[in-house]
Amino acid sequence: MGSRRAGSSSSPLFWPAPPSRAADPPPVHDTDGHELRADANYYVLSANRAHGGGLTMAPGHGRHCPLFVSQDPNGQHDGFPVRITPYGVAPSDKIIRLSTDVRISFRAYTTCLQSTEWHIDSELAAGRRHVITGPVKDPSPSGRENAFRIEKYSGAEVHEYKLMSCGDWCQDLGVFRDLKGGAWFLGATEPYHVVVFKKAPPA
């Protein structure tokens, strides 16, 4: 009886197909219709300039440092530019996308001499959780206090968005005034703050 050598069959061989890569989420766009990039700076402006200006930094609640993320009340002011980068290991794709974890930091110098990266505060100041800059005071086990997302503003046909803090869970970010009617702070509150992104000049 003749022997049969392995691999000599004329039958075609079939290999499992590699898993298909999920489609990337849609990109975020600036006011000129260009995709947001991790190597560029942007102003975060109110979609309705009658509701105030861009995001900036301000002291609050009796603290000089760290600085709180706040909104300039003057609709003609752009605030400070920010740099938005993917959370975790930087991918080769430099496009900032919807529903994807990002880190946000101001591209500005302060008298506090510390990081200007955003994070959600674990403490309640005036009964709310604020977005502040600087190092995280009491990090959670997950360490995701500095994780944020950009989501499309519901029903918007233009490039309008909302910001979310996405630590252990995601929360909409809105603007509210302090108890003394002073600064306008960014924090976990409703209604959420509707924003647009305007490209800033290179630093």
UniProtKB/Swiss-Prot annotation:
The lineage of its organism: Eukaryota, Viridiplantae, Streptophyta, Embryophyta, Tracheophyta. It comes from Hordeum vulgare (Barley). Residues 1-12 have a biased composition (Polar residues). The record marks 89-90 as: Reactive bond. Residues 15-26 have a biased composition (Pro residues). The keyword Magnesium does not apply. This is Alpha-amylase/subtilisin inhibitor. One of its GO terms (molecular function) is serine-type endopeptidase inhibitor activity. Disulfide bonds join 65-112, 166-170. Keywords: Alpha-amylase inhibitor, Disulfide bond, Protease inhibitor, Serine protease inhibitor, Signal. InterPro entries: Kunitz_inhibitor_STI-like_sf, Prot_inh_Kunz-lg. It comes from the Eukaryota.
